[in-house]
């Protein structure tokens, strides 16, 4: 469905209810895989685990895609009020980001003299350094700051989307090549301003420009995009299998032929990921569209309530899971029987981390006052309906409720 210049409420995107939590628990998987490598005592085991890490390193690119899609879908072609926009975001994302940044700073700091702690907490809030997963929220805030310019840019390129995507893709490949070859491995990162760039590149908006543009353009033609992925499901699955094989072959060449370090071979910012991540994005879109297209009598997809709750909880999962993973790595994982296969211990660590984070997030979002910790606003009188106050999905973890047609009661969705 092409976005039109009108003030009518736009149809609810059910597909995002699936894509958000799937991506969130995959983020948990990335971190679990990265921090449980010590369980492997063989070279082969380490290579297998790092190969899997490489294959799930698409999560940040998917988040960028979803963020741009949601923002564009809500705001493109409409008058933009910065005051209203930031009033919503201050409650939905800035407040929880600041609170969790302070909490992580407190836990990760050995001494807590008030002045030093306040200075460090402020620095971490500004840089996203309080915990390793918070960089994404900083990226989201950067996109918020340039959103009017981004929407204006989309207005200029919407008549030539494929040309714009091709140029953006080529620039992304070139950027990742230069970054991977000269900044991450070469001596450039140790000199002058490039040292700052090397440290902060993962939290810089333009590092992911292709995925933002891809999401923005997808939002302008949602119905056509949905029809396309539903029509080419077999090709999409086949393309993903080939892309996954290519990523693994590339990884093996890096470590076994070129003898590069595992950390370098598993870098998120490398050219191969520019080819792989879009394939995964299309695959996730196809899976989500298949799910959303099969509705029940209430015009909801099957299992909608389950996925809807997880989608609401996904922001909290993202924020809280590092606390749980750190505790498990210290108090549980070392005491798992060594007779258990490494794969089982890694899976259990992921399951406990993701499940615990989901449970805590759901509990928080249903609890008045505490719901603000996960960007929600529950009320004492009606915890379940309180989230109606956050009927915005213009950032990647929040979204509007279904849009009802007056007089028919039928839910519209993309």
Regions found by a protein language model. Give the residues of each.
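Membrane-interface helix-boundary motifs at transmembrane edges
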Residues: 9-13, 77-87, 152-162, 221-234, ...
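Functionally critical transmembrane alpha-helices in membrane proteins and complexes, commonly lining
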Residues: 14-75, 93-101, 206-207
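Alpha-helical transmembrane segments of multi-pass membrane proteins
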Residues: 25-38, 102-110, 175-181, 248-252
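Interfacial loop-to-helix transition and helix-capping segments at the boundaries
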Residues: 50-60, 127-139, 183-211, 248-281
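Transmembrane alpha-helical segments and their boundary/interface "anchor" motifs
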Residues: 53-60, 75-106, 114, 118-132, ...
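Hydrophobic alpha-helical segments with transmembrane-like composition
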Residues: 108-112, 116-184, 199-213
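Alpha-helical transmembrane segments of multi-pass integral membrane proteins
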Residues: 245-248, 255-368
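Membrane-proximal cytoplasmic C-terminal regulatory module of class A 7TM GPCRs
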Residues: 367-405
């Amino acid at each position: 469905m092409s976005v039109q210049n009108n003030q009518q409420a736009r149809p609810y995107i059910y597909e995002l209810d699936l894509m958000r939590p799937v991506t969130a628990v995959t983020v948990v998987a990335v971190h679990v895989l990265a921090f449980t490598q010590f369980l492997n005592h063989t070279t082969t085991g380490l290579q297998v685990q790092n190969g899997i890490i490489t294959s799930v390193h698409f999560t940040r690119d998917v988040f960028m895609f979803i963020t741009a899609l949601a923002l564009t879908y809500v705001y493109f072609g409409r008058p933009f009020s910065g005051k209203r926009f930031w009033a919503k975001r201050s409650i939905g994302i800035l407040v929880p980001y600041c609170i969790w940044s302070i909490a992580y700073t407190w836990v990760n700091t050995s001494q807590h003299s008030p002045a030093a702690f306040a200075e460090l907490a402020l620095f971490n809030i500004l840089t996203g350094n309080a915990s390793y997963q918070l960089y994404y929220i900083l990226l989201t805030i950067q996109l918020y700051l340039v959103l009017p310019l981004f929407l204006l840019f989309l207005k200029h390129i919407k008549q030539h989307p494929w040309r714009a995507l091709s140029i953006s893709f080529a620039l992304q490949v070139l950027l990742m090549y230069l970054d991977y070859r000269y900044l991450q491995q070469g001596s450039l990162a140790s000199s002058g301003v490039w040292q700052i760039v090397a440290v902060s590149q993962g939290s810089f908006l333009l590092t992911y420009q292709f995925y933002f543009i891809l999401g923005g353009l997808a939002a302008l033609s949602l119905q056509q995009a949905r029809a396309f992925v539903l029509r080419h499901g077999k090709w999409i699955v086949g393309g993903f299998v080939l892309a996954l094989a290519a990523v693994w072959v590339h990884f093996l060449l890096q470590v076994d032929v070129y003898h590069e370090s595992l950390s370098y071979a598993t870098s998120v910012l490398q050219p191969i990921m520019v080819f792989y991540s879009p394939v995964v994005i299309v695959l996730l879109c196809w899976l989500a569209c298949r799910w959303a297209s099969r509705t029940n009598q209430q015009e909801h997809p099957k299992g909608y309530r389950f996925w809807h709750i997880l989608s609401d909880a996904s922001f909290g999962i993202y924020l809280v899971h590092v606390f749980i993973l750190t505790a498990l790595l210290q108090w549980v994982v070392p005491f798992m029987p060594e007779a258990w296969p490494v794969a089982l211990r890694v899976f259990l660590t992921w399951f406990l981390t993701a499940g615990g984070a989901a449970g805590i997030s759901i509990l928080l979002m249903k609890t008045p006052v505490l719901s603000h910790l996960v960007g929600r606003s529950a009320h004492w009188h009606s915890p379940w309906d309180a989230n109606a106050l956050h009927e915005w999905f213009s950032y990647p973890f929040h979204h509007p409720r279904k849009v009802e047609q007056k007089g028919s009661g039928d839910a519209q969705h993309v």
